[in-house]
Structures are given as C-alpha cells and as structure tokens.
C-alpha cells in the first residue's frame, strides 16, 4: 500500500473508530468503510484491529504534533501562539462536531492497549505548553497548572459539546484561550502580550 493510500485508509479508520469506538468497530464495518476486503485489511495491518488503532493513533499523534504543538513553538506572542493552537484543535475536531478519539480509546477494554500512546501525546502537549509559559516568565508550578487548565478546558468543553449536541460550547472555550493564557502572566512589556 502506498503511503498516500495508507493515509487515506487511516483517515477512514479514524472516522470508524470515532463513530464506533475501538471495541464497537467490527472488522466487517472497517472492511466496508475502507473498501478493503478482510484479507487485504490483514495484509496491510497484520496485527488486526489493534494495529489499525495503533496506526490511527500514530497518524493522529503526528497530526496533533504538527498542527498543535508546533504552533506553540512558532512565531507570535504567547497568546497568539496559544490562539493558533486552539484554531488547530478547532480544525481537528471540526468546530466541536467531532469527538476526541484519544478520549474514546480510553474507554472500555482498549485502555491498557493504547495507554502509552495516549499518555505520550498528552504529556508532550502539556510539557510544551508549560515550556512556553515558563520561557515567558511564569514559574513552573503556575505554568503546569495553567497548561492543565487549558487541556482540561479543551477536552472537557469538547465532551460537553458532544454530550449536549452544542458545539458552540467548544468554540467558546477555544476563543477564550488567549485570555486564559494572559491571566497569571507576569508584568512583561504590554507589546509582548
């Protein structure tokens, strides 16, 4: 399978696992969604459904790294970089319309199988937010708490938006991120805020 073809199938797998969860997605359902026969699925993913989910998490981990964590390392003021990170999450979760597959995979029997990958993403994300805030002059303890607050807000607002069928909840939180980042920042030059 070419890299482009594999990415296309992994994108389809993302949709299947988002909609059905890991435990709920059957090989028949995956076969139908990807257009690959069961034999082809096992040829490309010899480890079966577990390998498919690991591939999905690798794919999403790279996407999240490239589109969220990298924005924190980019150009602009601290609030602007956090705003860009929020915009990336808006895109990934389609404005709050799509659930977080990382949260889905932690439900049911799949948790033990994929905990390491999920832990790695969340740890990398929290560490990068903390690093940026510390470099801006915030003390480590406050920066860690602020990073956790932002991550909890993003994930929590997404779950609430899904549970209430109201994506505006997620959008409002994303829009509030720059203000939340500014709270607790030192008295740096106003031009740098």
Q: Which positions does each model-derived feature cover?
A:
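Short, basic, alpha-helical segments at the C-terminal edge of helix-turn-helix-like DNA-binding modules
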Residues: 57-63
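Amphipathic alpha-helical segments used for helix-helix packing
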Residues: 93-113
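Helix-turn-helix
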Residues: 8, 12, 16-55
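Short, basic, low-complexity termini and linkers enriched in Ser/Thr/Gly/Pro
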Residues: 185-193
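Hydrophobic alpha-helical connector segments
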Residues: 68-97, 140, 147-150
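Amphipathic alpha-helical packing segments from all-alpha helical-bundle domains
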Residues: 65, 111-136, 145, 175-182
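Hydrophobic alpha-helical segments that form the core
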Residues: 141-160, 172, 176
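Amphipathic C-terminal alpha-helical segment
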Residues: 92, 107, 151-169, 181-184
């Amino acid at each position: 399978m070419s890299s482009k073809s594999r990415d296309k199938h992994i994108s389809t797998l993302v949709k299947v696992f988002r909609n059905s969860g890991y435990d709920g997605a059957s090989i028949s359902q995956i076969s139908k969604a990807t257009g690959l026969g069961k034999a082809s699925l096992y040829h490309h993913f010899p480890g079966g459904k577990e390998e498919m989910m690991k591939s999905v998490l690798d794919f999403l981990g790279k996407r999240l790294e490239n589109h969220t964590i990298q924005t924190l390392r980019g150009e602009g003021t601290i609030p602007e970089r956090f705003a860009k990170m929020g915009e990336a999450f808006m895109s990934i979760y389609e404005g709050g319309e799509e659930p977080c597959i990382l949260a889905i995979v932690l439900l049911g029997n799949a948790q033990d199988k994929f905990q390491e990958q999920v832990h790695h993403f969340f740890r990398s994300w929290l560490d990068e937010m903390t690093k940026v805030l510390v470099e801006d002059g915030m003390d480590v303890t406050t920066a860690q708490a602020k990073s956790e607050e932002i991550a909890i807000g993003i994930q929590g607002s997404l779950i609430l938006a899904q549970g209430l069928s109201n994506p505006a909840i997620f959008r409002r939180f994303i829009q509030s991120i720059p203000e939340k980042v500014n709270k607790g920042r030192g008295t740096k030059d106003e031009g740098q805020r």
